[in-house]
C-alpha cells in the first residue's frame, strides 16, 4: 500500500476540483482544445483529424452543421463515428525528438576521441521515443524509452562490452551484423527500457545510461565537444539490468540495482553481475552532491570496484563550478585508475557561454593532464555551436597497450598535443 502523503492528498483534492470546474466550463462551451506542451522543441506538433476525413473546422462538407462540430446531422454519422467525438492522437503521451551533431577535430588520440581527424563528420544522428511514467495521486504509472544513434560515435556508444565472435567480429544486440557500416560509422541503441513509478519509487528495467560520472553520452548534455579522459576510460557508458530510484525527501534520492556488468546489451559476458547504486542530495539551495558506486563482475574487465563523486555548485545566476572524481580498480587494469576533473562555466548571455575544464587522469602509474577552453554559441534555440581548444600533456609519457603514445601516435617521452575542435548540434 502506498504511503499516504497529506500534501499529495491536497493535490488530489485540488485536481478533482479542477476537473469538475473544467467539466462545467465544457458544458458552457468554453473549452480550449489545445493543451500546452512542455519542452516543445522536442515534441512534434501534430494536427488531429476525425475519421470522416476532414479537419473538424471544415466538416460542413461531410454533413456537419456549418457552425462547427458542436453537433451533427444525419449525414455526419459514418461507420458509427461522429465528427463531435474526441480527437484521436496516435502520439498521445509519447515524446519524439532527437538531434544531429556534426563535428571536426584536428587530432584523434588513442584515448580520447572517435572518428577521423581533420574531417567534418556526423558524430551523432540521434532520435528517441519516450513515454514518461507520470504518477497521479500515488498510483503506479508505466513508461518507456528507446534511443537510436548513427554516426562515428556509434562504435563508442553501442554495447561494446558484449562478447564478439572471433570469426565474424559481431556480437549480440547492437553489435550484430548490419549495425557496423564502415568508415568508422555504426548504429547503436544506448537505451531501451521500461519503467514504472508511483511518484516516490521508480523502477527501470532494460538497457540504460550509467549513473556514473558527470559527462553523458548525448552531445546535448555536455558543455564541451570532447570528453574527459575519465569518461572514456574509467566509466561505463551503459548497463543492462534493473535499477530502483527511491525519493527519500525533497532533497535526496537513493539508487540501487543489479546490472549485467558494464556496457553489455541484454547479455552477460563471463557471467558478469554487478551492483549499481548511490545517492544524490541537495546540500543547499546552490550545492548538490552525487555519489555512485558499482562493484562485482563487470564483464570484459573482470571483477572490480568503481565510484564517482560529483559536487555541483551554482555560484550565482551566471557562474557554475563542478568537481568530479573517479576511482576504478579492476582485474584487467591490475592497478588503480584515478581521475579528478574540474569545470567552470560562465553564462555571458542567454545565447553565449564560456567554459573551462581541467583534468588529471592517472593509469598504471603515469599521469595525463588536460586543459580545455571553449564556447557555447546558440544562434537559435535549436542550434548550438561549440568551438574549443584542448591541450594534453604527460610529463612521464603516456604509453598505450600497443606501445604507441596516446598523443598523435608520437614519441614516448615528454608527450603533448594541442587539439582544435568544433561541432554544431541541431535539436528537434
Enumerate the predicted regions with their spans.
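Bacterial Sec-dependent N-terminal signal peptides
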Residues: 1-16
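Beta-barrel outer-membrane channel/assembly domains of diderm bacteria
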Residues: 29-203, 244-246, 312, 345, ...
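Residues that define the transmembrane beta-barrel architecture of outer-membrane proteins
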Residues: 92, 116-125, 185-190, 236-240, ...
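Repeated loop/turn-to-beta-strand initiation elements of outer-membrane beta-barrel proteins
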Residues: 94, 135-138, 200-203, 251-256, ...
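Outer-membrane beta-barrel pore domains and translocons
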Residues: 101-105, 147-151, 208-210, 257-261, ...
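Gram-negative outer-membrane beta-barrel proteins
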Residues: 104-110, 135, 152-158, 211-215, ...
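Surface-exposed coil loops of outer-membrane beta-barrel proteins
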Residues: 107-117, 155-193, 197-280, 290-295
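Detector for outer-membrane/organellar transmembrane beta-barrel domains
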Residues: 251-253, 270-365, 369-370
Amino acid at each position: 500500500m502506498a504511503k499516504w502523503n497529506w500534501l499529495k492528498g491536497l493535490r488530489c483534492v485540488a485536481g478533482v476540483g479542477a476537473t469538475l470546474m473544467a467539466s462545467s466550463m465544457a458544458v458552457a462551451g468554453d473549452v480550449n482544445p489545445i493543451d500546452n506542451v512542455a519542452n516543445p522543441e522536442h515534441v512534434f506538433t501534430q494536427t488531429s483529424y476525425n475519421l470522416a476525413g476532414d479537419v473538424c473546422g471544415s466538416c460542413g462538407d461531410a454533413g456537419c452543421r456549418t457552425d462547427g462540430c458542436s453537433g451533427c446531422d444525419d449525414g455526419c454519422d459514418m461507420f458509427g463515428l461522429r465528427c463531435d467525438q474526441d480527437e484521436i492522437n496516435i502520439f498521445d503521451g509519447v515524446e519524439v525528438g532527437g538531434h544531429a551533431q556534426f563535428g571536426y577535430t584536428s587530432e584523434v588520440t588513442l584515448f580520447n576521441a572517435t572518428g577521423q581527424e581533420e574531417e567534418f563528420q556526423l558524430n551523432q544522428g540521434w532520435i528517441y521515443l519516450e513515454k514518461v511514467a507520470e504518477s497521479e495521486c500515488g498510483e503506479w504509472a508505466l513508461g518507456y524509452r528507446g534511443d537510436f544513434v548513427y554516426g562515428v560515435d556509434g562504435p563508442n556508444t553501442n554495447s561494446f562490452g558484449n562478447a564478439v565472435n572471433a570469426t565474424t567480429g559481431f556480437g549480440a544486440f547492437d553489435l550484430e551484423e548490419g549495425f557496423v557500416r564502415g568508415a568508422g560509422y555504426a548504429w547503436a541503441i544506448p537505451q531501451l527500457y521500461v519503467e514504472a513509478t508511483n511518484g516516490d519509487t521508480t523502477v527501470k528495467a532494460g538497457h540504460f545510461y550509467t549513473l556514473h560520472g558527470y559527462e553523458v553520452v548525448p552531445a546535448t548534455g555536455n558543455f564541451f565537444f570532447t570528453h574527459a579522459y575519465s569518461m572514456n576510460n574509467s566509466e561505463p557508458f551503459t548497463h543492462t539490468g534493473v535499477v530502483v530510484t527511491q525519493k527519500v525527501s525533497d532533497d535526496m534520492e537513493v539508487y540501487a540495482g543489479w546490472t549485467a556488468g558494464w556496457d553489455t546489451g541484454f547479455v552477460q559476458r563471463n557471467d558478469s553481475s554487478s551492483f549499481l547504486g548511490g545517492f544524490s542530495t541537495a546540500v543547499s539551495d546552490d550545492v548538490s552532491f552525487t555519489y555512485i558506486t558499482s562493484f562485482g563482475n563487470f564483464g570484459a574487465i573482470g571483477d572490480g570496484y568503481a565510484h564517482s563523486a560529483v559536487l555541483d555548485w551554482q555560484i550565482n545566476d551566471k557562474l557554475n563550478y563542478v568537481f568530479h572524481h573517479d576511482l576504478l580498480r579492476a582485474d584487467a587494469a591490475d592497478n588503480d585508475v584515478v581521475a579528478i576533473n574540474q569545470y567552470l562555466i560562465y553564462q555571458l548571455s542567454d545565447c553565449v557561454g564560456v567554459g573551462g575544464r581541467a583534468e588529471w587522469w592517472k593509469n598504471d602509474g603515469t599521469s595525463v593532464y588536460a586543459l580545455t577552453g571553449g564556447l557555447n554559441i546558440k544562434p537559435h534555440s535549436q542550434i548550438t555551436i561549440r568551438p574549443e581548444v584542448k591541450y594534453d600533456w604527460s610529463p612521464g609519457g603516456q604509453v598505450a597497450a600497443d606501445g604507441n603514445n596516446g598523443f598523435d601516435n608520437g614519441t614516448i617521452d615528454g608527450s603533448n598535443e594541442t587539439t582544435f575542435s568544433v561541432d554544431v548540434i541541431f535539436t528537434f
